A protein has these predicted regions:
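Interhelical loop and adjacent transmembrane-helix boundary motif
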Residues: 3, 13-16, 22, 172-206
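Alpha-helical membrane-interface segments at transmembrane helix boundaries
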Residues: 21-37, 62-73, 85, 89, ...
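Glycine/proline-centered hinge or cleavage motifs at structural transition points of membrane proteins
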Residues: 76, 134-135, 148
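Transmembrane alpha-helices
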Residues: 39, 138-175
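Alpha-helical membrane-protein architecture signal
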Residues: 21, 25, 29, 61-65, ...
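Transmembrane-helix boundary motif in ABC transporter permease subunits
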Residues: 38-69, 82
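Intracellular coupling helices
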Residues: 114-132, 140-147
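Generic hydrophobic transmembrane alpha-helix motif, especially the helices
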Residues: 70-105
């Protein structure tokens, strides 16, 4: 009898006597790559936009940003996938991890913006006043006083954003496409766990 393959070999779909169907290592690697790239862009962008909205709520540009944030937050993920396909996949002439991360980033930003804005708004006004009284300008007070005080709420928003996009399938079907190989190239098609789940559902023999 053939030895039973270890969980590690089964996950990587390495041959052990007979080819082992399945394997999700390519999906795990792809998920980490795309999620990492999306987080690197979405977190600072979301925090900056949230801080801007919290401090300039009556500004016309801030009102436009707020409207755009609400619009993106309510947009179905499949529509974001189609838009990213037009904006990124078509100009790049191919599916890629970059396109997938752009779609995930677009979905993450509104959640981070709103969590940052709402957390900053509920901070005691005395924090900002004390910082300004000590001679700090608005930007310095925001960076050194308000944002550290709002860390808990902002971090919660980041976790919610990551939790939302990590299970998305529709936008990645239009952007990352999927790949059966463990791939680290960001300019090539790449797999993700939700895409693998969809593939396994459609073809149980995989």
């Amino acid at each position: 009898t053939e030895p039973t393959p270890t969980a590690y070999k089964a996950m990587k779909a390495i041959e052990a006597g007979e080819p082992i169907p399945g394997g999700i290592a390519n999906g795990i690697v792809g998920t980490m790559i795309m999620l990492g790239m999306a987080v690197i862009v979405a977190v600072p962008l979301g925090i900056l936009c949230g801080a801007f909205l919290a401090e300039n709520s009556k500004n016309r540009f801030a009102q436009f940003v707020s409207y755009l944030t609400d619009l993106l937050q309510g947009t179905p993920s499949v529509i974001i996938g189609i838009i990213t396909y037009i904006w990124v996949v078509v100009p790049m002439k191919g599916y890629s991890a970059i396109a997938g991360s752009v779609a995930l980033c677009i979905m993450m930003v509104p959640l981070i913006v709103r969590s940052t804005e709402e957390t900053l708004k509920i901070l005691p006004a005395s924090l900002k006043e004390a910082g300004l009284a000590l001679g700090g300008n608005k930007a310095r007070v925001m960076m050194r006083v308000q944002l550290p005080a709002a860390f808990g709420g902002i971090f919660t928003g980041i976790l919610l954003a990551v939790s939302r996009v990590i299970g998305e399938t529709a936008p990645l079907m239009f952007t990352a496409l999927g790949c059966s190989l463990i791939r680290f190239s960001v300019d090539k098609p790449i797999s993700e766990v939700p895409l693998l789940t969809w593939d396994f559902f459609n073809d149980p023999t995989l």
